[in-house]
């Protein structure tokens, strides 16, 4: 694989062709000549991507990055990185490596070696040792841990075949002054003292002047970049203050230098040193430590062309989903962007490789300038993904001074994306729900075997909530332990649940409480038996948004465990996890698995929104937002249930390490392969992919598999599931935006969760890099049907960050760079700007809304749950009806006013007309201010309708006081819902409706505008005796002899006696014409419905698909009757319809396909209709040609396709032929003259 990379660096093979060669098992014809140089390396093709990732990690070994070390799940190519002699093989599985491998120890006289990593290794293996980042408490902290030497993971030193790393010497003289390797006699080793909690020295922070947007701003809670405090722990931080500093010491650097000397001197005299202290003048090269950021300069970039080429290769692999984790690579790139310094290497090493820039022996990153340049190049290729990140991350990227210096164009694009983004991700966790109420339909006496079992269940339910309340009160105390405090009570409670029915009832209670408490993001919230009061609303602060941001930063977890955190149970989920562990009940676990499986199947099959509302459906905006919220609730519930199902199902098999021997592993595999899965996830996954519901199925399935043990991925059943997921991952290419494919954010969510799954420690490292032939049997398509969830934008940034909180690590990494300090918790510092409290309490009127909410909550707490549901239902429907009422009354009146004003302007201007845009702006400026009446009318509507609805739905026996309170609460909730929507959307709604009316009138304006204006209403002689449109539509929908029945008779199977007479068709069209000419009661919706039905009738007439009543020999309409009916329809379209008629449907594949079922096929009516449409200016030649072109692209039977092509050529060549009669046999003749003669 090193040869492949060198060929790319020497530009012997184009990058695009090489990426296609890597991504496909069979190269295409156009790539065969370009990748001929790589044909000999085809067996090693799958190893190129892991080699490239490890190569980049090795090249960045001397970089001191910002933030924690990041894992890379990449097996090492054995061809490029041979195994160390004597190291045992591990079945072909690669080893684990850090994104930033070990830094090289410097000279003994100048630098102290890095501290060895405290985390354990999985064992020897070929290539760099790989370790999982952020694994709970076991992960090493940034400030106190360095890296092990490069040869500690089994890699050969430089000169033995490991490319890219600096040359290391094994014969360096020992550093006798290093107190870590050579401590003084009689002292305690540093490791024991390092476990004591050190005191923290507070460094003074100088106040700097305000900086521009492109420079990071400092606050008083974090030091500036130039004064980063040392992250080396020390228990002697307070002692040097008594040593007396000289009065002339004015520099912080001098002060630190003296403190180092004092610590070194005192440490040599003290019997218990805290940590190794380097000698004076030799700073410890920690990750950020006490090193200031080195400025990056684009002019000092070395090997610019080489870096651009490697960045292009790397970005192409990311774009084609050839890397396991997209966001892990972005985190690595941002670490390069925010790297502070590089550990210096020997000058001889760099000089020896100056001549071969295209060789892998030459370091890729020689300086910070190279790192930043490479990172910016990759970010430019990944801008599409960056633009979908949250608003805070975009702001930090746009303000990064290095990015501005290296690529002002990218910085401008990021700033534009930030200004246009509305993706504000909130981390505030809503309070948890109350306790599960009594369920009379399932928890009554009739569902238990005896009175004793019933009373035992009620008692155990009370014990369960006592345990939950005690956990809530004490779980945040450091000295409190769940098992010691609650374990015995839980096991005693489970022992009394002896009957199976008692277990099933308790499991149902357990599951419902789990969903109520943990369904919110993070799963943490307020009290169990009642929501905590909203303190912020009670304060009534002037800047409530600032206080909410402060609340968000205080209660949100600071870090999710790095970009690849292990599966955990945050917040309230920890209680349920510990409860299951302490119960240790096989009966309870089995009932719980059954209940969770059933609920997952139920939610996974739930019918969810399948379409996105269009621009014309303004009234359904609120309903669409509600449907998106419903999808989010269902998805989060599925992920929560699947997480606990996986935890319980794989709990008996989970262990820290895989089986030690191959024989033991084979025996376990043979045994486990006979055990059926607890849930048929393979069938559910295949159903989700076929139904285009992967965006709902895959996230919860990933949660289930994340708790699998080491044996699960080796079982054939689960191996096929992982292979199917891998195929799906490779098909989710973000750059493909074809029509009908999966939405971008839907793809991004799936890529994020799948990438996280592939980094789980129990998933084999080589699983992601399977050969294409091993996954060809599982074909996956991302082209979504019109009825699939995948094509609907149901995922937004809030849901993306809720399901994948580790994406927020990108923002925390950039924020730590701005703050200038890595801190002690992984390099992330949260800046909090304090808000003054002088105005708190000065606005008593602003607390009324909060008091009303508390009073309503107290009222519902003392009433049955059905009362709350009734009031909320009434408020929801009355609010929605209010919006529709405002649109039908106020907005409709304003539209009529706009039409009248437009008529006056058209009459006054005559033939001159005017600019439509100016007319629209003029009308909107006059009418939009009247939208303020919507709030007043909305309040009146809610006050008038809500009490009536509440009284109708509540029982008659409801007390008057309760009824009155419920009515008032319903009025308030409905008014708040309606007014909030109207205040935000009424102006846009008025503009949209006025624009539609203006466009419709301008299209209808002809050479005689006065006549057109007069024709919009009824004629003066109209007596309004025409059939009402509502009656006509009712007949179309329900009456047995109606136009809809005609269409139904023609469309489906029917009895021989069913049919319609030509006289009835003429009568029905005459009634339609009367209704269209009498405009008094005709609304646009009814007119659109009639227009669509008339077009469908014309299509059936052309295809001769209407059954006719009469003798048995006559089943088709005569040509004369059909032409007369088509003439009537053309007249209606031309003279009577004033709205748009969807004439394009006449040439849709569905309607033209009706001719395929006719034997013999006759095309004269279609030719006649097309010619008349052109002559009456109802459709243009170009429009018909476009429709015909789309028809030719459709899939037809062979003979039908030839007839269509011949007919279209005749129409386009001879558009004015007099009524030709063409049959199918005539269209198949090759000679056009014969066809015309027979016509």
Swiss-Prot record:
Start-end of Polar residues biased regions: 61-72, 219-238
UniProt keyword annotation of Iron present: no
Effect of deleting the gene: Embryonic lethal; embryos die before 7.5 days of gestation.
Region described as Interaction with ASF1A/B: 193-213
In-chain residues carrying the UniProt-annotated modification Phosphoserine: 270
Phosphothreonine found at: 70
Residue ranges crossing the lipid bilayer per the database entry: 317-337, 631-651
Subunit composition and interactions: Interacts with ASF1A and ASF1B. Found in a cytosolic complex with ASF1A, ASF1B, IPO4 and histones H3.1 and H4.
InterPro entries registered for this protein in UniProt: Codanin-1 (IPR040031), Codanin-1_C (IPR028171)
The keyword Nucleotide-binding is assigned to this record: no
Descriptive protein name: Codanin-1
Organism: Mus musculus (Mouse)
UniProt topology in membrane: Multi-pass membrane protein
GO cellular component: cytoplasm; endomembrane system; membrane; nucleus
Region named Disordered: 61-249, 261-299
Keywords: Acetylation, Cytoplasm, Membrane, Nucleus, Phosphoprotein, Transmembrane, Transmembrane helix
Known tissue expression: Widely expressed in adult mice, the highest levels can be measured in erythropoietic cells.
Modified residues (N-acetylalanine): 2
GO biological-process terms attached to the record: chromatin organization; import into nucleus; nuclear envelope organization; protein localization
Location(s), subcellular: Cytoplasm; Nucleus; Membrane
The protein's role, per its UniProt record: May act as a negative regulator of ASF1 in chromatin assembly.
Pfam families attached to this UniProt entry: Codanin-1_C
Low complexity bias: start-end ranges: 77-88, 95-116, 138-179
Coiled-coil parts of chain: none
